[in-house]
Amino acid sequence: MAPSKTEIAPLRAAKYPFGNIVDALRHAAAHTDEGIIVYHPNSISTSSPPQTVSYKDLLHQAEANATRLLQQKLCSPKSIVLVHFESALDSIVWYWSVLLAGGIPALTGPGMFSQNPADRERHLRHLSETLNSPVCLTRPALLAPFEEQTADDRIKARTVDEILAAPEIADVADAPLPALTPSSTDMLALMLTSGSSGNAKAVPLTHQQLLAAFRGKSTAASLRFPRSPFLSWVHMDHVANLVHCHIFAIVSGISQIQVPAPDLLINPAQLLNLISRHRVSRTFMPNFLCAKLRRQLESGSPEYILDPGLNLETLYIDTGGEANVTEVCIALQSLLSRYGAPDNVFKPSFGMTETVAGCIFNSHCPSYDHAQRHEFACLGKPMPGVRMRVTRLDTPSEEAAPGERGSLEVTGEVVFKGYYNNPAATAEAFTSDGWFRTGDLAFIDSNGNLHLDGRTKEMININGVKYLPYELDAALEQAQIPGATPSYFCTFSSRDATMDTEVVVVLYLPSYVESDDEARFSTQSSIIRVVAMHTRSRPRVVPLRPQDMPKSTLGKLSRAKLKTALEEGQFATQQQINDEAIRRYQQKTRASPETPDEAVILDIIKEQLEIRSDDDSFGVNDSILSIGATSMDLVAIIHRINKCLQPSQPLRLTDILKDSTARGLAVALATGAAPRSQDQSSTHVYDPVVTLQPHGTKSPLWLVHPGVGEVLVFVNLAHHITDRPVYAFRAKGFNAAAGLPETPFTSLEELFTTYRDAIKERQPHGPYAIAGYSFGGMVAFEVSKLLEQDGDEVRYCGSWNLPPHIKFRMRELVWEECVIHLFYFVGLMTELAAYTHKPTLQEFNRANRRLDAIRYLRQHCDAARWDELGLSEEYYLLWVGLASNMQSLAVDYEPSGSVKCMDVFVADPLSHVAKDRIDWVEGRLSAWKEFVREDVRFHDVQGAHYTMLNREYVEAFAGTLKNVLRERGL
């Protein structure tokens, strides 16, 4: 085939003074004082300096670790080792440790795991087979998915904590690390192309390939300040960080800044502050982040404070991963220019793992795209070391004409040569003459610039994160949404220039009467909640007619045909009818902000949940919990409200659980700011019920808190229950923190009858469904008994990992034990770490210095998590007191009587209670049979006693719960 006009001649750039990246690190360590500047979570705007690790220190630490890996036989020459961490610094240190030990690091992170347990198992099995049963290095907090493996041939996970704690072998401890001199064709890393669906491909990266890429990237960029550092917030399992920032900086002999992604994604203006403080010469900012930064700067909000004297003269913005809207680039260029940013600061690029990140660059954005009136910025021309071509769709052996859409292919010394241990995928990925098929549709304009024009794959790309349409279809099906016809969901992505990123489109066949606006609104709201839960984005929802959604003879909907029909306007009438009906219903039911505080709070909620500011489908009376907000969203919303409005009495997390609407939070602010009158205090009535999910037509689910008394643990679970309301009980006494006369329960009988009465007030008639987590399991049992004594039917009584006989455990939970359990339960420290402080806590307690005990423990907990929760030391003291009081009520509790049926959810037991699940069930949980008249069933769930509702397990837990409710006729 004749070469394309856009091909670039082979690389002829000067060589580096080393031939591999190991020597590059040695060179940087020996000849520079540069290194890694690490920002820990929530530390950008604090006075504490970031952590600095010089390349010299990195080399020494990695060499020491490499020696340990060899001593403990965890790494051998050319063996593959998974480097699996959340922290960038952990990933960096252990990447080099494996490499210096002669192994091949394969970098992964917790983000590779699906919430579906079957997908996780399948993914790990696939990795084990592909990577030849590798060892995995990780931290204790990340072990859970590896411990779930059931296959015989599984990945063996080891924590680096164990490795570093192991004694050195005496006769080899002083032996020097074998000298490592890799050849240019040796692998330096394996990077995964995908991960959540079990079909990951491993891309080998070689020393020769990376050095060629760095020469090309440097030539294409021609940085004005080449000695200034790089900055990355991307996880280290992506080439955009490992290669394009971390190793590139080392090879270039310059420093690098590593920042946690959440800090910048919540507040992109901080990225500008870091660029100015460190005179950063190169960083990455995809379109969705550019758009968010633009909105911040244009808003002029005092929440987004820029450093005085902000200077962006060194700036060079790599942008890619999704199409860049030209209008966003133009607007942001103007804003950044005020602070010295150079013209054409944006460098839209095309890159993949297989091409070592960006390899085709547009160096004239936005000026070129503005002049050409491009809706989306072009991707420019290949850098040295890469050639590109577009081949015709109908005749792949022929090159497409300028402007003609075809298949994008690339080749060159930067491009990988094949997938690791996957000859079939390699054969499919390359043409007969050795060009790599990217899987993208594209065209090259008359000036030789690349433009992407769709994808051959159906992957949905939201804010740079990819989702599989069939997974969203399945989630909608599993939600059993009233008003939607089963098996008639079709999801895909769509986008126009008004959007920052792609949007999920959901087409569905309604089962309600077309004139029923309320049913239409309820159905659409449920669909939005399900999609938001999975993608953190708000979908475009279009109900269609039966004739619009024909099925094939195999019962399938054609995603491609439906997407084409939508984009061609064939469903415009249905969209208009739906929009008018939704608007009509909202006008009847929605309320607008009535005070400045309500308006501000509503804006904060919308921004946090990524709801467009002009989208009036969410109002001041709508619950944050009803649209898929996670527990971390609640924390962020409270933090942002307090920071923006600076009330005299800051909102607490408990306020949002009490009333999760913008209006309710505004009332809480006003109430907290005003002095508490005697009349207000005297009229306070304790309400134990928190509404976690108000929607659905089936019998409500009632959830009883664990021993800590709070309901935050149920928030993520409630998002997965979309077919029925979900209510949770919150213990009595928390409102005392707000100065209200609310005292804790004085007896179990008071607790039981209070919760029974609250259920009857909101749900006068059965059948009832009630479950309790840990301590709450006992309460659920007793409340169910009271309901049955009144003649009501309880079809589901659930005990989540609690046996009937608990008084001995309750007697063990003295005050210091309650402190330890609370701090572990809310994520302030690990259980192991918390127990090391037990003797000191006992001393404080004996001296009646309980507040000092809380202050002491605070010094040893996760400071970032403490700030996230936003609670005071006095509040934790109150909370511990409530938990201790409540559990002390049960020190003489003896179960008696019976309920008709019970379902016991079984998680891993506490280590000091039972040795394993079999022992736990046979020795303790099976005793429930004595207190159930007809039917007690046991259901295994993933995770342990304190983690079974964690994010990685909650979807599977919800699936089990839904099945149980269905089996019980609910």
Swiss-Prot record:
Pfam families: AMP-binding, PP-binding, Thioesterase. InterPro entries: AB_hydrolase_fold, ACP-like_sf, AMP-bd_C_sf, AMP-binding_CS, AMP-dep_synth/lig_dom, ANL_N_sf, PP-bd_ACP, Thioesterase. The keyword Signal does not apply. The modification O-(pantetheine 4'-phosphoryl)serine is found at S631. Its EC number is 2.3.1.-. It catalyses: 2 indole-3-pyruvate + 2 ATP = didemethylasterriquinone D + 2 AMP + 2 diphosphate + H(+). Induction: Specifically expressed at both asexual stages. Expression is positively regulated by the secondary metabolism regulator laeA. Expression is also positively regulated by mpkB. Expression is also positively regulated by mtfA. Residues 700-961 are annotated as: Thioesterase. Keywords: Phosphopantetheine, Phosphoprotein, Transferase. The active site is at S774. The keyword Phosphoprotein applies. Pathway: Secondary metabolite biosynthesis. Residues 595-673 form the Carrier domain. Changing S774A: Impairs the generation didemethylasterriquinone D from indole pyruvic acid. One of its GO terms (molecular function) is CoA-ligase activity. Disulfide bonds: none annotated. It comes from the Eukaryota. Residues 135-489 are annotated as: Adenylation. Didemethylasterriquinone D synthetase; part of the gene cluster that mediates the biosynthesis of terrequinone A, an antitumor agent. The first step in the biosynthetic pathway for terrequinone A is formation of indole pyruvic acid (IPA) from L-tryptophan by the aminotransferase tdiD. The nonribosomal peptide synthase tdiA then immediately converts unstable IPA to didemethylasterriquinone D (DDAQ D), via condensation of 2 IPA molecules. The symmetric connectivity of the 2 IPA molecules is thought to arise by head-to-tail dual Claisen condensations facilitated by the TE domain. GO terms for biological process: secondary metabolic process; terrequinone A biosynthetic process. PROSITE patterns: AMP_BINDING (PS00455), CARRIER (PS50075). Belongs to the ATP-dependent AMP-binding enzyme family. This is Didemethylasterriquinone D synthetase tdiA. CDD domains: A_NRPS_TubE_like. Gene3D superfamilies: 3.30.300.30, ACP-like (1.10.1200.10), alpha/beta hydrolase (3.40.50.1820), N-terminal domain of ligase-like (3.40.50.12780).
